[in-house]
Amino acid sequence: ISPSLLYLFSLATLLAVVTGTGTPSQEVHPSHYATTFNKSLFPKDFLFGIGSSAYQVEGASNIDGRGPSIWDTFTKQHPEKIWDHSSGNIGADFYHRYKSDIKIVKEIGLDSYRFSISWSRIFPKGKGEVNPLGVKFYNNVINEILANGLIPFVTLFHWDLPQSLEDEYKGFLSSKVVKDFENYADFVFKTYGDRVKHWVTLNEPFSYALYGYNGGTFAPGRCSKYAGNCEYGDSSTEPYIVAHNLILSHAAAAKLYKTKYQAHQKGNIGATLVTHYFEPHSNSAADRVAASRALDFFFGWFAHPLTYGHYPQSMISSLGNRLPKFSKEEVELTKGSYDFLGVNYYSTYYAQSAPLTTVNRTFYTDIQANVSPLKNGAPIGPATDLNWLYVYPKGIHSLVTHMKDVYKNPIVYITENGVAQSRNDSIPISEARKDGIRISYHDNHLKFLLQGIKDGANVKGYYAWSFSDSYEWDAGYTLRFGIIYVDFKDNLRRYPKYSALWLQKFLLK
C-alpha cells in the first residue's frame, strides 16, 4: 500500500483501535481526496469544527442524577410523534465514550468540538440543588477536549428544558423561565468559564418555538387542533410568546456574562440561529417582498431583536398585538447582546406571495408567503433523503452577505451545515460508509462560504453537522447526519465514513 494511502487510513486505523473494530477496510480510492481546495485558502485564525448536542448523543438519560427533560417526557408520552417510536435514552452513548470520540475529532485534524450541556444533568429540577456527577461529567469533557488540543464551543440550551420547569410554569411560555435560565447560565459560566471561551446561549430558538408550539412535532408538543395533532396549545400566539421569552433569556444570560465574567474569563458569547435562505418564486415585486418577509420571519425574528432591540417591521405589520412587545429596559438589554452569531444553514427555498388570512392562523399563514423547495415542480437543487433538505450551496453565500448588509457585519460562525442519509441496516457497513453526497455537500458549501468571506462577510469558523450518527429528534434513528458511522445494531461501534477521510485531507492532517 502506498504511503499516501497509509496517510489516508490513519483515521481508520485509530478508529479500529479505539472502537475495537479490527482491521479497517481499505477500499477508499485516494482520488476521492485529490483536491487543491483545502484549509490553507481560509484565514489563518478560521476555526474548523464539528458539532453534537446533549440529548442527541449523550444517552445515560436516567443515570448519575440527571433529571428528565421535556424530550424524555415527549418521547415517552408521544412515541407516535417519533418516526421510529424511539427516544434519546441511549443516543450515541457519548456519556461513556467521550474520550474516544474526542480523540477521533483530534485525529481528523479539526480545531474545535461543539457540544451542548444538558440543563437537567446540572440542575435535575432546573434550579435549586446541583447534581455533582453532572458537573463532573462536563468538567471531564471540557478537560478532555483541551487535552486533545481542541477548542470547546459550548451551547447552554439545545431544546432539552428540565421537565420540572415545564410542570411548574409551562417552561418558555412563562417569563419566569428567564431568571431560572440566567441562574443556570451563571453556574455554568462560574464552573467552566475558566476553560470555555466560546459560549452559545441558545441553539435554534426558531426550531424550539416553531416545532414545539406551531406544529407540535417537537417537545413539548403544543399546537392548535387545526395545525397538528396536539392536546393543548395555540399556534396563533404561543410560538411568538415562547420566542420572546427565549430572546429575553439569551439577553439576560449574555448581560450576566458580560458584566460578571467576561473581563477576567476573556471569552465571547452569542446565540445560534437557523434559517433557510429564500429566493423569490418569480421576479415580481410581490414575490421579492415575500422572500424578504420570509427571511424576516425565519431569521430576523431573532436576529433583529438581538441586533436592534425590536422585531422586524414585517412581523409587526403581520402580527399586530399577537407579537409581544419589548419594554424600554428589555430593548436596552436585548440590543447588541452578542459578540458573535452562530448560523445553522442547510437549504434554500422559494417564496411566493400569499394573502394574509384571519382564520386558522399559524406561523406559516402569518408569513404571507408560500415557501417551498419546488418551483413549477422543479427542485431548487438536488433532493436528499431528508424531505425538506435540498442542496443549494449558493444560499450560504447569500445568507452571510445578508448578515453583513442588514445586521452590521457581525462575527459569524457557521455552527451547523450538513446533510442526512436514510438509515439502511440491510446494506453492509463498507457500503454505508460511502457518503459521496456528504463530501460534495461540504466541499461546495465551503467554496461558497469562502467567496462570502472574500466579499467581506466576517465569518470566523465552520462547524460541520454532525460528528456521529445520533438521535435526530422527531426522525429518531432513521437518519444519519454523521461523518462517523454508528452501528446501532452492534454496540454503537464507530466507523469513519468517506466524508471523515475527505475532511481529514481537506484539513491537511
UniProtKB/Swiss-Prot annotation:
Signal peptide: 1-19
Disulfide bonds: 223-230
Binding positions (a beta-D-glucoside): 56, 158, 203-204, 346, 416, 465, 472-473, 481
Catalytic activity: (R)-vicianin + H2O = vicianose + mandelonitrile
GO molecular function, one term: hydrolase activity, hydrolyzing O-glycosyl compounds
Record-annotated active site: 204 (proton donor), 416 (nucleophile)
Top EC category: hydrolase
GO biological process entries: carbohydrate catabolic process
Record-linked InterPro entries: Glyco_hydro_1 (IPR001360), Glyco_hydro_1_AS (IPR018120), Glyco_hydro_1_N_CS (IPR033132), Glycoside_hydrolase_SF (IPR017853)
Record EC number: 3.2.1.119
Expressed in which tissues: Expressed at high levels in seeds, at moderate levels in flowers and at low levels in roots, stems and leaves.
Keyword field: Disulfide bond, Glycoprotein, Glycosidase, Hydrolase, Signal
Residues carrying covalently attached carbohydrate according to the record: 38, 360, 424
Function: Hydrolyzes the disaccharide glycosides vicianin, pNP beta-primeveroside, 2-phenylethyl beta-primeveroside and furcatin.
Family named by the database record: Belongs to the glycosyl hydrolase 1 family.
Protein name: Vicianin hydrolase
Organism name: Vicia sativa subsp. nigra (Common vetch)
